[in-house]
Regions:
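Basic, flexible Lys/Arg- and Gly-enriched helix-loop patches that mediate nucleic-acid binding at interfaces
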Residues: 2-160
């Protein structure tokens, strides 16, 4: 049984358990792959509590301990859990059998600190635009910048 303190949406509980992303949980619900107390649920937004037994793809959902890894991502590694081009991923850099995923991303040709976790709630807080959490980047440049270029950077750079 998965511990839920109060009534919560089923897809959120599934995602917070570490089983899959919220969007994937919604897809599983719509496709009839989720049961609550033995009853198939296909309604998004269905509410559950701590007494409910949730089954996803014929497996009882169990509470997963939250795991947090602060990882230095080197250049030449993709910030995904798998890569169709066969490139090394951030998960290739660690040894774990847990379903972890990166919080945010760093480009393939960049290096830096990256958080890996199975905590969907924390991930949502950190990356959702409504929370307006700043990200800080340090860039090395070749050459010497002039005054105009420095002023432009000091104003900030908006990245799409």
């Amino acid at each position: 049984m998965f511990l839920v303190i109060s009534m919560e949406r089923l897809q959120k509980v599934i995602a917070n358990s570490g089983y899959c992303s919220r969007r994937k949980a919604e897809e599983l619900i719509k496709n009839g792959k989720v049961m609550v107390n033995g009853k198939k649920i296909e309604e998004l937004g269905f509410k559950v509590d701590g007494n409910d037994i949730i089954t996803v793809e014929n497996k009882i959902l169990k509470k997963e301990n939250k795991e947090y890894i602060l990882l230095y991502k080197p250049r030449g590694v993709v910030t995904t859990t798998s890569d169709e081009k066969g490139r090394k991923t951030v998960l290739d850099l660690i040894e774990t059998n847990k379903r972890l995923y990166p919080v945010g991303r760093l480009d393939y040709d960049t290096s830096g600190l990256l958080l890996l976790t199975n905590d969907g709630e924390l991930t949502n807080i950190l990356i959702h635009p409504k929370n307006e959490i700043d990200k800080v980047y340090i860039a090395k440049i070749n050459g010497i910048m002039n005054g105009f270029e420095i002023k432009t950077l000091e104003k900030g750079v908006l990245i799409d």
